[in-house]
Amino acid sequence: MAIYSERETWSTAQMHDHQLEGLKRTVRHAYQNIPFYHETFKNIHITPGDIQSLEDLQRLPFTKKHHLRENYPFKMLACPMDEVVRIHASSGTSGKPTVVAYTKNDIQNWADIVARSITLAGGQKGDILHNAYGYGLFTGGLGLHAGSERLGCATVPISGGNTANQITLIQDFKPRIICSTPSYLLNIGEAMMMQGIDPASTSLQYAILGAEPWSEEMRFQIEKLFHLKATDIYGLSEVMGPGIAMECAECQNGLHIADDHFIAEIINPDTLDQVDEGQYGELVFTSLTKEALPIIRYRTGDIASITREKCLCGRTTTRMSRVKGRIDDMLIIRGVNVFPSEIERYICNLEELVPHYQIHLQKKGHLDHVTLHVEVKQEFYKKLEMNFNHPMAVKLVESLGKTLKMKTLISVDIQLKEPHSIPRSEGKAKRVLDARTKIIPKTSIH
């Protein structure tokens, strides 16, 4: 399979020399132009001149999302506004949105990184790429768009939503590549079958999927449904956007990090110490080439591991595992830590079910109670004669309940749902509905 840039096969020494030069430049740029970093470094008595090796990165403090929000909207910029050519922002559901900005060089670098990612996924010049990521302040749509054009693909900027139109254009334009969230691609496939279209009969050969955690079992379902190769793309707007890391279609064994643009670390989120290679922890990124908004040791909140072993595809870049989940998405049920993706994998293993589900959390007395709503397949629903009290349904619920109890150590109340009853997503799927945090009125004490 083609390799987009010779940097992807650099030796360790070549990459480390490049990274150290970029780290020194980034620290100096941030120190001189961003008051937040200047004050933070000053408080711990560090200047840019103190950074003389890659190991010195660990002397620098972490950056967190709240730092960006506290400096809303433009106090984290390291360049004048007349050098900024684009502004993106993440959702502000828990406060002000997180604003990120790009210079012309930033946009060019980003396009190059994403072109590299599309190549990793199996794309090449002349392909038609169907981009069903959302366009707008979200970085997904425009990030994939720029990379697709840089590579020389014919880009279909359909964005998310309007599933019927998605299907029409896939049928008519015959794209080789599709980009979307994994849950939305399943939605498209399901809608195709309802129209009598076999998803495996389309022109699609490769899918670039991301923006939400998804299990290996869901990958199997997608690849089986569409008869294509599904690869995982990673990114977040605070660091750059999509393309920070990308799985190669050849091996599907870890996501290749763009080491020439970012330094990745894995830390224990409690002790903040680096963990050994191969161990899971929180993913941390430092940018090396960004001009408008350089970021230093940004704590992503994503749980993953990394390896520096050479991939069988020939690339020597650091690889990260697929994201296991987010620290803030991790469910704590009666003291047990569970990621939604762990529950998803056992749903996908059952042929009677489809991977459309929601996890409902509530309090019953003082105890956490978990209810899993999961849809059955249409053919199984017919076998049940549309009756969830049917012995086959009861057996399925008992089997899944025992598996979840054994594998996740939590008790789950399972409710089977009829086909197409759980709301579909045109972007990131809403998997967890947590009603445990409702405010309880205080009572006066006499």
Regions found by a protein language model. Give the residues of each.
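Short, well-ordered beta-strand segments
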Residues: 128-131, 284, 373
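Active-site glycine-centered loops adjacent to acidic/histidine catalytic or metal-binding residues
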Residues: 211, 235, 335
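Active-site phosphate/ATP/adenylate-binding loop shared across adenylate-forming ligases
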Residues: 1-6, 63-231, 243-254, 362, ...
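Nucleotide 5′-phosphate-binding alpha/beta core
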Residues: 1-89, 94-112, 116-120, 366-371, ...
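AMP-binding/adenylate-forming catalytic core of the ANL superfamily
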Residues: 178, 289-410, 427
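Conserved beta-strand termini and adjacent loop/short-helix elements that scaffold enzyme active sites
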Residues: 158, 233-235, 267, 362, ...
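Conserved AMP-binding/adenylate-forming
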Residues: 205, 214-310
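Generic structural signal for residues in well-ordered beta-strands
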Residues: 155, 230, 264, 357-359, ...
